[in-house]
From Swiss-Prot:
Species in which this protein is naturally found: Pseudomonas aeruginosa (strain ATCC 15692 / DSM 22644 / CIP 104116 / JCM 14847 / LMG 12228 / 1C / PRS 101 / PAO1)
Family from the record: Belongs to the peptidase S45 family.
Xref: Pfam families: Penicil_amidase
Keywords for the protein's UniProt record, in alphabetical order: Hydrolase, Periplasm, Quorum sensing, Signal, Zymogen
CDD domains: Ntn_PGA_like
Protein name: Acyl-homoserine lactone acylase QuiP
Chain's gene name: quiP
Length: 847
């Protein structure tokens, strides 16, 4: 996320890159490696460090993943902070600035709208509450970790990674509260329905509240939410929500930085009766936006009172998901809806802003915020809050100059209510989970986790378990799927669901447990967990594969994690073949002009014969992907366009978040008003639009991939491309800085690579349905624990261990991830040398 001022060295390096000659580019990269070689910490030798009690050993495996060996837990936490800073300093600094709403201090005015959005959300308050309510023990852990981070910062303050060095920003020392802030940011990223609610207002402005329910389905077997959309009926939304475009734009920017609205992850546990060894297995792969580096980094810690291996997040002390020698644990998002947007009626009287609450006008609370901006003078702005929370559009909106304050006047405000002000022991719960040795201890630990809505699956040698965590509001009326009228107390919250209603299970008779962001409870369940479930196909595939064998082992877990079969294909084929559709569809195809008719018949025949395997080399998968793309556009673009307009962007983005109108219309909704093409005089129906889409899919492949059918490949349309945090910030930089980034794109970024799968496959590879085929969501890490093995845990990351482009471990993890080359994390002392070797960096207590 850093903003490198690369123009300093462009005279030497950028010209060769701009001309694109291989020799010049290679020379540029070599020069950059040499220029920033001293920003890489040593991997051997001895370093005296103040703050340690005893010597610490740090060894690294072939991919640079560290093994930290210490004599005390204090030193383990200190060393983890030191290692995180050495591997991911730029990432840590960027996460902290994003959470604080201070990116503009490093990036400049282009990040100011992001900062305004984040200041309004006020994660600092959430972090303070979490940290203040953590146990004294946990606070000490955070303090020791921070001292480790700062020991590295002090030692290498003049040898910063390229992006930080060129930005001119000097990182502040790490505070214990900063780790709570990173946690609050990651938790905020689980707020999928926040983006959906913002998008729903944009869509309602385009099509009206009467049609909105058709665009916001909740699940294949549930009725459309017409009752929920009724809340918005009669409200004049068009032009009456000042700053809505600014709010949506800022939320989109935060999401693009991997920190908002990600429907993420698979996990499952196999009971002993279904395993080859007669012992449990657990697998987890967390889905996050393609990024360089990954949010995750692997670490193994060995100390007398704490052993664990797994994934960690730079900025947080501990192992988030992994294995501790006795217990394995992994997590997915519930997609819990624990926030709401409220439309507030506003009016300005004199210098005060008022909002309507149950028939009375109340003054908003005002919060002053000062923004420091690189290259500009500071600005001071007011953020308004109502009884429901901060007004997201009080600081965001159209203004003549981005640096000018925004005077919010009459119209509707967007108040954001969340659970982030609630106090609990969530931070302690995560640490206790990493130390749990049995299923019973794991259940005890997960019940402490109230701030974050997760499906946590865990296993010991003989047992498996699942627990839903979080805090879920009881709504007096409404479902919270769409924004509610804030002036009407009927839509307020009434406490939270009793934790006893949080779903859980242990050792089920079926012999497995698994979650994939799907609906895990039946409609009408006593606690309203969500209305924003993800597509069900990944969960259905887990059930299909987990229940198909009684001899599961490590290899079957790997096959499941890399499985690219989509069950949506069979559902699409069943829809085509339905008695009520088969004949009308054939008639609609026959009614097409000759050229389109032959293409539509070809597409129909091939899709009906398709086996559903979305491999990168598959020709039929390319045609299938083209059909999904064209059908979305044929059904919806006439009313939601143009393509670059806010409504279409909002529509495509919501399909990334949860079960979508695109899928819902393909599998049903024959009576939807969106089947009619408003651009033509006649009234189209579903068969007519499907026939057009079939023909258009073949034409699309011909135009993009050529007329030779054998040359069609899904991976030629659908690709992975790893972008650095610096590259992701490029749209918010000045023209000169963007040119500098472009000149060294090959140094910072990787790809494209052919991709298989899509949003419905276990090997997830999601893209903008109806927009393009660029993969944005992947399994950012994979881990497997097989208690039947002498060394149970293996794992693989999606990028390199280091976030420093000068490091040999910046991108070496990509090839391992693409090819499924997992790394072992041994717990038996005699196996450590085999994986980590004998080369070590020794940290010693400084005198």
């Amino acid at each position: 996320m850093a903003s490198p001022a690369f123009m300093r060295f462009l005279p030497r390096c950028g010209a060769a890159a701009a001309f694109g000659t291989l020799l010049g580019l290679a020379g540029c990269q070599s020069w950059l490696d040499d220029r920033y070689a001293d920003s890489l910490p040593p991997t051997s030798g001895v370093q005296p460090i103040k703050g340690l009690a005893q010597n610490v050993s740090i060894r690294r495996n072939a991919l640079g993943m560290p093994l930290i060996e210490t004599g005390t837990f204090h030193d383990a936490l200190f060393a983890l902070g030191y290692v995180h800073a050495s591997d991911r300093l730029s990432q840590m600094v960027s996460l902290r600035l994003l959470a604080q709403g201070r990116l503009a201090e490093m990036v400049g005015p282009g990040a100011l709208e992001i900062d305004r959005f984040m200041r309004t959300v006020n994660l600092r308050q959430a972090a303070e509450i979490q940290y203040r309510n953590a146990s004294p023990r946990l606070q000490r852990f955070f303090e020791v970790y921070a001292r480790g981070v700062n020991a590295y910062l002090y030692r290498y303050r003049d040898k910063l990674p390229m992006d930080l060095a060129q930005s001119g920003y000097r990182p502040e020392y790490w505070k214990p509260e900063d780790s709570a802030l990173v946690f609050a940011l990651l938790n905020f990223g689980l707020a999928v329905n926040l983006q959906e609610e913002i998008a729903s207002l944009t869509l309602a402005q385009k099509v009206g509240s009467d049609k909105l329910a058709w665009l916001t389905p909740t699940y294949p077997d549930e009725n459309l939410p017409f009752d929920e959309a009724e809340k918005l009926k009669g409200l004049r939304l068009d032009g009456q929500v000042p700053g809505l475009a600014g709010v949506e734009g800022a939320a989109r920017q935060v999401a693009a930085l991997s920190m908002l609205g990600v429907a993420a992850s698979n996990n499952w546990a196999i009971a002993p009766q279904r395993s080859r060894s007669g012992k449990s297995l657990m697998a987890n792969d967390t889905h996050l936006p393609l990024s360089m580096p990954s949010v995750w980094n692997y670490v193994q810690i060995r100390s007398p009172k704490y052993q664990a291996a797994g994934v960690s997040i730079a900025g947080l002390p501990g192992v988030v998901a992994g294995f501790n020698g006795k217990l394995a644990w992994g997590m997915t998002m519930v997609l819990g809806d624990n926030q709401d947007l409220y439309l507030e009626q506003l009016r300005r009287q004199g210098n005060r802003l008022y909002y309507l609450a149950d028939g009375k006008w109340q003054p908003t609370r005002e919060r002053q915020e000062t923004f420091f901006i690189k290259g500009q003078r500071p600005i001071r702005e007011v953020i308004h809050e109502t009884r429901h929370g901060p007004l997201l559009n009080s600081a965001l909106g159209e203004r003549k100059n981005i640096l000018q304050p925004l005077p919010l006047k009459s119209g509707y405000g967007l108040a954001y209510r969340s659970i982030q002000q609630e106090a609990d022991k969530t931070l302690d719960g995560f640490f206790d989970l990493s130390r749990a040795k049995t299923i019973e201890q794991a259940f005890d630990a997960t019940r402490e986790i109230r701030a974050m809505p997760l499906n946590i699956v865990f296993a010991d040698e003989k047992h498996i378990g699942w627990q839903v965590t979080g805090r879920y509001p009881n709504r007096k009326e409404g479902r919270g799927l769409l924004p509610s009228p804030g002036w009407d107390g009927r839509y307020d919250w009434d406490g939270y669901a009793d934790p006893i209603l949080h779903p859980s299970d242990q050792d089920p008779q079926q012999g497995w447990l698994g979650t994939a962001n799907h609906r895990t409870v039946q409609p009408g369940y006593g606690a309203q967990l969500s209305n924003s479930w993800y597509y069900p196909e990944r969960a259905e595939r887990i059930a299909q594969l987990a229940g198909a064998s009684k001899s599961h082992d490590t290899q079957s877990m790997i096959r499941m994690q890399y499985d690219q079969t989509s069950l949506f294909v069979a559902k699409l084929q069943a829809m085509f073949d339905n008695p009520g559709m088969a004949l009308p569809l054939r008639q609609a195809i026959d009614a097409l002009p000759e050229a389109q008719r032959s293409r539509a018949r070809e597409a129909y025949d091939r899709l009906m014969a398709f086996d559903g395997k979305l491999t990168a080399s598959s020709s039929d998968a390319a045609l299938y992907g083209a059909f999904l793309h064209e059908s979305a556009r044929q059904i919806f673009l006439d009313e939601l366009g143009p393509e670059d307009g806010p409504a279409w962007k909002a529509f495509v983005e919501t399909a990334n978040l949860s079960y979508s109108a695109q899928a819902d219309h393909l599998l049903g909704r024959d009576d939807s008003p969106f089947w009619d093409d408003t651009r033509t005089p006649q009234k189209e129906d579903k068969p007519a639009i499907l026939a057009r889409s079939l023909a258009a899919a073949v034409e699309f492949c011909e135009q993009r991939l050529g007329s030779e059918r054998k040359a069609w490949q899904w991976g030629k349309l659908h690709t992975y491309e790893w972008q650095s945090d610096s590259s992701k910030m490029a749209p918010y930089l000045g023209a000169g800085e963007r040119a500098g980034l472009g000149a060294i794109k090959g140094y910072l970024d990787r790809g494209p690579y052919p991709a298989g799968g899509d949003h419905t496959t276990l090997d997830v590879s999601a893209y903008g349905w109806g927009q393009d085929f660029d993969t944005w969501l992947i399994p950012a890490m994979r881990l497997i624990v097989d208690f039947g093995q002498s060394e149970p845990m293996i794992g693989v990351n999606s990028s390199g261990q280091s976030g420093n482009p000068a490091s040999p471990h910046y991108a070496d993890g990509i090839d391992a991830w693409l090819k499924g080359r997992y790394v072992s994390f041994p717990f038996q002392p005699q196996n450590l040398d085999r994986v980590y070797g004998n080369k070590r960096l020794t940290l010693t207590p400084a005198r």
